[in-house]
Amino acid sequence: MIDRGSEVRILREESYWFNEVGTVATVDQSGIRYPAVVRFEKVNYSGTNTNNFALSELVEVSSPKKKDK
């Protein structure tokens, strides 16, 4: 299950970050086409380090780390 804090690999071939790993910042539950906002370490040509992706374009590499309370 892709959730906030998950490390994901990008499968969208036309993306600058294709096959790169990023961290999910948020996942929108309202039913929009590209609900997952993914943040990356490196920036693209326009200086952006975030992008929206569909859940079908992402593969979870590692799940979010649980906080100890």
From Swiss-Prot:
Q: How does it sit in the membrane?
A: Peripheral membrane protein
Q: Does the keyword Thylakoid apply?
A: yes
Where's it found, cell-wise? Plastid, Chloroplast thylakoid membrane
Question: Which GO cellular component terms, listed alphabetically, does the Swiss-Prot or TrEMBL entry include?
Answer: chloroplast thylakoid membrane; photosystem I reaction center
Work out whether the entry's keyword set contains Cell membrane. no
Task: Give the chief site where it resides.
Answer: plastid
Q: Which GO terms describe its biological process?
A: photosynthesis
Q: Which family does it belong to?
A: Belongs to the PsaE family.
Function as written in the Swiss-Prot or TrEMBL entry: Stabilizes the interaction between PsaC and the PSI core, assists the docking of the ferredoxin to PSI and interacts with ferredoxin-NADP oxidoreductase.
Its name, as the record gives it, is Photosystem I reaction center subunit IV
**What is the species listed in this Swiss-Prot or TrEMBL entry?**
Phaeodactylum tricornutum (strain CCAP 1055/1)
